[in-house]
Design a protein with these regions (language model features):
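Short aromatic/hydrophobic "clamp" motif used to bind/position activated sugar donors
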Residues: 83
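Cell-envelope/extracellular polymer assembly enzymes that use nucleotide-activated donors
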Residues: 2-4, 33
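Short, acidic, metal-binding catalytic loop of nucleotide-sugar glycosyltransferases
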Residues: 21-31
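Short, flexible, basic/aromatic active-site loop/helix in glycosyltransferases
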Residues: 132-169
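Conserved donor NDP-sugar-binding/catalytic core segment of glycosyltransferases
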Residues: 91-128
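Short beta-strand/loop segment that forms part of the nucleotide-sugar
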Residues: 31-40, 59-61
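Glycine-rich, basic loop-to-helix element that forms the pyrophosphate-binding segment
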Residues: 60-78
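A conserved acidic beta->alpha catalytic loop
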Residues: 22, 38-47, 63
Length: 193
């Protein structure tokens, strides 16, 4: 199996439904699986999953285990060579996984891949690529210096990369992270402490 898409859910039934629909469309030509971990939602997320998506693996936690442990539980069930950690309020384009996997296979020393994130109104989210918020970096963000002098003070949003450019960044947002499952296991997954 090439890809396992891991979606951790908590009380966002309608977003989850849209997310899973988009993932199903995006993996039609890929040997892939979808694993949904529900963190003890109080809405009808699990019922919806059972009715609408009976072929999707659903793990129902009896307590809210949090982001790190919830995702670790999902990855422990994954069979794909690659895993994608995906937030339930994310909708992916039909070619997302094909393009990202093609890119990943061309890399010699692959770490974690993020992607360009767009909000519900079609605007680019600068959180897609970030720098480490060291004191000076945080200061330039809070004071707005990064907007005035992006090349000098734009490290918070990794503004050395334009929104459509590919490159290395220090931090990826947790909404979409793709990596080899072997790497995830090698680093011990997410820190649960």
């Amino acid at each position: 199996m090439q890809l396992s898409v891991i979606i951790l859910n908590y009380n966002v039934r309608y977003f989850l439904e849209l997310c899973v629909l988009s993932v199903q469309n995006a993996i039609q030509n890929i040997d892939a699986e979808i694993i949904v971990i529900d963190n003890n939602s109080q809405d009808d997320s699990c019922e919806m999953m059972k009715q609408r998506f009976p072929n999707v693996k659903l793990i129902e936690n009896k307590e809210n285990t949090g982001f790190p442990k919830g995702n670790n539980i999902g990855v422990s069930q994954a069979k794909g060579e690659y895993i994608c950690i995906l937030n339930p309020d994310t909708v992916v384009a039909e070619d997302t996984f094909t393009r990202v996997l093609t890119f990943a296979k061309k890399q010699n020393d692959l770490g974690i891949i993020g992607c360009k994130l767009i909000d519900g109104t079609g605007n680019f989210l600068p959180e897609s690529k970030r720098g480490v918020p060291r004191p000076f970096v945080a200061f330039s963000k809070i004071t707005g210096l990064y907007k005035i002098f992006p090349q000098t003070f734009g490290q918070y949003y990794a503004q050395h990369l334009s929104e459509n450019k590919t490159g290395k960044v220090d931090i990826l947002v947790g909404a979409f992270m793709l990596m080899k499952r072997e790497l995830y296991n090698e680093i011990g997954g997410f820190d649960e402490n």
